[in-house]
Amino acid sequence: MTKYIGYVGTYTKGGSEGIYSFELDTEKKALSEPKLAAKLGNPTYVATNKNNTILYSIEKADGQGGVAAYQIDKNSGELTFLNHQLIDGPSPCHVSVDDQNQFVLTANYHSGKVHVFPVQEDGSLQSPVSEAAHTGKGPHERQEKPHTHYAGFTPEHNYVVAVDLGIDKLYTYKLKDGVLTESGSHSFAPGAGPRHIAFHPKEKYAYVMTELSNEVIALEYNPTAGEFREIQVVSAIPDDFTDNSQGSAIHVTQDGRFVYVANRGHDSIAVFEVNQYSGELAFVERVSTEGNWPRDFVFDPTEGFLVASNEETGNLVLFERDKETGRLTLLPSTVSVPYPVCVKFLHQV
């Protein structure tokens, strides 16, 4: 029997109390009922370090926002609070940690900033040592100011990448001794509203999910210069769909053959096959997430399964994934959790 532990970040309203844990049984092809793993205010995004020993979560508390650190029991999935670092103002929306477990990054949608938190030997966090603040605005009504939605590391860890929905830009930074220094930027079409980026694991490609235009943008990435070049833009929703829909999560499979994205409003997962020579995407299929407003999804460590989290209907939905074709098959395993907005597995097979 093979079971994998996962975590769900939530908005703490409507009965939600914080971070929940669950298990995927790959033999039974079923999810366990989620249980509360940590009481925390608005843990809307979580990340685990490479060794699966520490979980970092966004936190909102009493007019402050920041990051909380937890020690992970890899056998039970239980979380033990280590510490947190809070800053006055709204909470961030995205958190990531480098492979060496030296720095945690947060992106703040409300302030348009990226913060850098040094990690101590036990995995706990020091107060932030630097920040990067964006400026500008875009043409869409939601682009009245910068809205940084993602901050993470490039695959070779040469750069930090920040994606800003409010100003249609991607920034690259050098990070040395905890200090961010801007290296360059890449602009997207006005009003696109870029949200998240995912890198190809083998080739020099990256893929950006836009929230406002609900598109996937394929980029060529130069890891030496930290520069990007646009090679393709594809819609993630059908051309004849006219209702409101917003792009959310994007992930590339470990073999680099497929890109998956979630569409909130159309309420679907779209699958694209990657041309390994050009980086361009070819549409494969869209499947319903069997719920409303899929904020996130995740592959299990074998990538034979996909779990989607529907925020408005409060459910996790399980799919089996065909590794050859990329296609998804809905499984009869759906579990409830209030306002799920982020889902992650411990990523070690």
UniProtKB/Swiss-Prot annotation:
UniProt keyword Transcription regulation present: no
Composition bias type Basic and acidic residues, residue spans: 138-147
Gene Ontology biological-process annotations: glucose metabolic process; pentose-phosphate shunt
Record-listed E.C. numbers: 3.1.1.31
Gene Ontology CC terms: cytosol
GO molecular function: 6-phosphogluconolactonase activity
Region (Disordered): 125-151
SUPFAM superfamilies in alphabetical order: C-terminal (heme d1) domain of cytochrome cd1-nitrite reductase
Catalytic activity: 6-phospho-D-glucono-1,5-lactone + H2O = 6-phospho-D-gluconate + H(+)
Keywords linked to the UniProt accession: Carbohydrate metabolism, Glucose metabolism, Hydrolase
Xref: InterPro entries: Cycloisomerase_2, Haem_d1_sf, Lactonase_7-beta_prop, WD40/YVTN_repeat-like_dom_sf
Pathways involved: Carbohydrate degradation; pentose phosphate pathway; D-ribulose 5-phosphate from D-glucose 6-phosphate (oxidative stage): step 2/3
Coiled-coil ranges from the UniProt annotation: none
Superkingdom of origin: Bacteria
Family per similarity comment: Belongs to the cycloisomerase 2 family.
Role this protein plays: Catalyzes the hydrolysis of 6-phosphogluconolactone to 6-phosphogluconate.
This protein's name: 6-phosphogluconolactonase
Lineage: Bacteria, Bacillati, Bacillota, Bacilli, Bacillales
